[in-house]
From Swiss-Prot:
One of the GO BP terms on file: defense response
Organism of derivation: Oryza sativa subsp. indica (Rice)
Residue numbers spanned by region Disordered: 468-526
Topology versus the membrane: Multi-pass membrane protein
Gene: MLO1
Gene Ontology, cellular component aspect: membrane
Main function: May be involved in modulation of pathogen defense and leaf cell death. Activity seems to be regulated by Ca(2+)-dependent calmodulin binding and seems not to require heterotrimeric G proteins.
Residues in the Extracellular compartment per record: 1-16, 82-142, 287, 369-383
Protein name as annotated: MLO protein homolog 1
Length: 540
C-alpha cells in the first residue's frame, strides 16, 4: 500500500520547498508573458498602429477565455465524472473502434474498481452505468482546447506576416506613381483604344473572353501572377477617382496596409459561430464516417473558390471598361461597386478567410494533440500516410491563404462601393469624431433655445376668449323640443398668465430674449454639422 501511494502523494505529503518552487516558476512565467504583452501594446500605440493594438487586445481576450474554460473544466471535473449514463448510450457514436483490447481493459478496470472498495469510478457502483466523461478524458479535452487556441493565434500571425511580405512589392509600385512616366501614362490628353490597354488585354484575352473558360482562367491565375503592376495601378486610379479628387497624392499602399491591419483584428479572434463549428466537427468525428479526412479538404475548397472569385472581379471590371467605350481618354478607369461580390457583400470574403484559418488550425491542432497524447495515436491515425497527406494539405493551404488570397482580398475588396474608415489617419479620424461630438452638443443647445423661444412666443400672445372657452362649440347645437331647458353657463375669465406659465419658465424665456444674438446664431450654424454623418461603412 505504501509503495502504491509513493507515486501519488497529496499536498500534505509534499515538501514545502517543492510547492514553493513550482508556484514561483508559474508566477514568474505568467508575469513575464503579461509584461511582454504590455510592452508590445505600448509599442503599437507609440507607432500609431491602433488596429494592431486592438488585435493584441483580442488575443488577450482569447487568453482570458481560455483561463475561464480551464477554470470551469477544473471545477466541474468531479461533478461531471459523477454524472452516470447507461452503457448502451456510451457505446454509440464512438470516434474509435471498440476492439477486444478495449473490452478487456474495461473489464480489468472494473476489477480494479471492485478491489479498491469503491475508491475508483463513482458510476461503477451502479449496475450498467458509466460516467458521462471520466476525469482523464476531461483532462485530454482541456489540453486540446488550449492547443487549438495556440494554433489559431499562430496561424493568424503567420497569415499577417506573409501577407505583409507579399505587399512589400506593391510599395515599389506605389512609389512609381510620382514618376513622369506614370504621369504621362495617365495623361487625359492621350486617347487609346480600349482593347489596346494593358489592363484590358491581360484580362480579356482569347480564353478570358469565353464565359465558360473564364472561371478556369481565373482559377489558375491566382497561382501565377495574381496581382500584377498594371492591376494594382489601375485599381488604385479607380479608387482615387471614385472617392477622392482625381489628382490627389494619395498613398494607396499605406491605406491597404492599414485596412489589412484592421481586418487582422477580426480574423485573430475565435467568435462564437467558429466555436460552434469546432463543436460540430467533434460531434461528427464518428468511426466509419471519416469526418476528419474529408472535412480537411473543405477549407482548401473555400480558399480556392475565394481566390477564383477575386480574380473574376478583376476580369469583370475589365469587361465593363471595354463595354463602356471603344476609345478611352488617359488611363482605363474601373468603377468600384458592390455588384461584383457575392450578394453585394464584400465583407463575406473576410468571413470565409476567417473560417478557413480557424478550420485549418483546428485540423493541425487535432493532429498534434492526437500524436502527442498517449493512447490516441493508434485510434485516430490508423492510416498514418493519410494523416501525413492531411498535414501537407494543411501547410499548403496556410501558405496559399497567407501569401496569395489574403493580400488579393485586401486589394480587390477596395473596389466595393464604400471606402473603409482607415481612409483617414488615426489622428484625423479622432479629430472628425470630436468635431461631430461638439456639433451634436451645439445642436442640443440650439433645440433647447428654439423650444424656449416658442414658449416665449406663446407667453407674449394672449389666448382668445373663443379658444379659451368651449361655449362656442354650442353654436351649431339645435335644441330639441323634448329637451329640458338648461341654464346658460358663462365661461369664467381666463386665468392669469402667471398661473398658466410657472415662474421658472417665464424667467427662462426672458433670459433667452436677453441672450446675445450671436450665441443663437452659432447654435443654428452648427445644425448642418450636427446632422452630418462621419461614420464609414466597414466592409467586414
Amino acid at each position: 500500500m505504501a509503495g502504491g501511494r509513493s507515486g501519488s502523494r497529496e499536498l500534505p505529503e509534499t515538501p514545502t520547498w517543492a510547492v514553493a518552487v513550482v508556484c514561483a516558476v508559474l508566477v514568474l512565467v505568467s508575469a513575464a508573458m503579461e509584461h511582454g504583452l504590455h510592452n508590445l501594446s505600448h509599442w503599437f500605440r507609440r507607432r500609431q498602429k491602433k488596429a494592431m493594438g486592438d488585435a493584441l487586445d483580442k488575443i488577450k481576450a482569447e487568453l482570458m477565455l481560455l483561463g475561464f474554460i480551464s477554470l470551469l473544466l477544473t471545477v466541474a471535473q468531479a461533478p461531471i465524472s459523477k454524472i452516470c449514463i447507461p452503457k448502451s448510450a456510451a457505446n454509440i457514436l464512438l470516434p474509435c473502434k471498440a476492439g477486444q483490447d478495449a473490452i478487456e481493459e474495461e473489464a480489468a478496470s472494473g476489477r480494479r474498481s471492485l478491489a479498491g472498495a469503491g475508491g475508483g469510478d463513482y458510476c461503477s457502483k451502479f449496475d450498467g452505468k458509466v460516467a458521462l466523461m471520466s476525469a482523464k478524458s476531461m483532462h485530454q479535452l482541456h489540453i486540446f482546447i488550449f492547443v487549438l487556441a495556440v494554433f489559431h493565434v499562430t496561424y493568424c500571425i503567420i497569415t499577417m506576416g506573409l501577407g505583409r511580405l507579399k505587399m512589400k512589392k506593391w510599395k515599389k509600385w506605389e512609389s512609381q506613381t510620382n514618376s513622369l512616366e506614370y504621369q504621362f501614362a495617365i495623361d487625359p490628353s492621350r486617347f487609346r483604344f480600349t482593347h489596346q490597354t494593358s489592363f484590358v488585354k491581360r484580362h480579356l484575352g482569347s480564353f478570358s473572353s469565353t464565359p465558360g473558360l473564364r472561371w478556369i482562367v481565373a482559377f489558375f491565375r491566382q497561382f501565377f501572377g495574381s496581382v500584377t503592376k498594371v492591376d494594382y495601378l489601375t485599381m488604385r486610379q479607380g479608387f482615387i477617382n471614385a472617392h477622392l479628387s482625381q489628382n490627389s497624392k494619395f498613398d494607396f499602399h499605406k491605406y491597404i496596409k492599414r485596412s489589412l491591419e484592421d481586418d487582422f483584428k477580426v480574423v485573430v479572434g475565435i467568435s462564437l459561430p467558429l466555436w460552434f463549428v469546432g463543436i460540430l466537427v467533434l460531434f461528427l468525428d464518428i468511426h466509419g464516417l471519416g469526418t476528419l479526412i474529408w472535412i480537411s479538404f473543405v477549407p482548401l475548397i473555400i480558399v480556392l473558390l475565394v481566390g477564383t472569385k477575386l480574380e473574376m472581379v478583376i476580369m469583370e471590371m475589365a469587361q465593363e471598361i471595354q463595354d463602356r467605350a471603344t476609345v478611352i481618354q488617359g488611363a482605363p478607369m474601373v468603377e468600384p461597386s458592390n455588384k461584383y461580390f457575392w450578394f453585394n457583400r464584400p465583407d463575406w470574403v473576410l468571413f470565409f478567410i476567417h473560417l478557413t484559418l480557424f478550420h485549418n488550425a483546428f485540423q493541425m491542432a487535432h493532429f498534434v494533440w492526437t500524436m502527442a497524447t498517449p493512447g490516441l495515436k493508434k485510434c485516430f491515425h490508423e492510416n498514418i500516410w493519410l494523416s501525413i497527406v492531411e498535414v501537407i494539405v494543411g501547410i499548403s493551404l496556410q501558405v496559399l491563404c497567407s501569401y496569395i488570397t489574403f493580400p488579393l482580398y485586401a486589394l480587390v475588396t477596395q473596389m466595393g462601393s464604400n471606402m473603409k474608415k482607415t481612409i483617414f489617419e488615426e489622428q484625423t479620424m479622432k479629430a472628425l469624431m470630436n468635431w461631430r461630438k461638439k456639433a451634436m452638443e451645439k445642436k442640443k443647445v440650439r433645440d433647447a433655445d428654439a423650444f424656449l423661444a416658442q414658449m416665449s412666443v406663446d407667453f407674449a400672445t394672449p389666448a382668445s376668449s373663443r379658444s379659451a372657452s368651449p361655449v362656442h362649440l354650442l353654436q351649431d347645437h339645435r335644441a330639441r323640443s323634448d329637451d329640458p331647458p338648461s341654464p346658460i353657463t358663462v365661461a369664467s375669465p381666463p386665468a392669469p398668465e402667471e398661473d398658466m406659465y410657472p415662474v421658472p419658465a417665464a424667467a427662462a424665456s426672458r433670459q433667452l430674449l436677453d441672450d446675445p444674438p450671436d450665441r443663437r446664431w452659432m447654435a443654428s450654424s452648427s445644425a448642418d454639422i450636427a446632422d452630418s454623418d462621419f461614420s464609414f461603412s466597414a466592409q467586414r
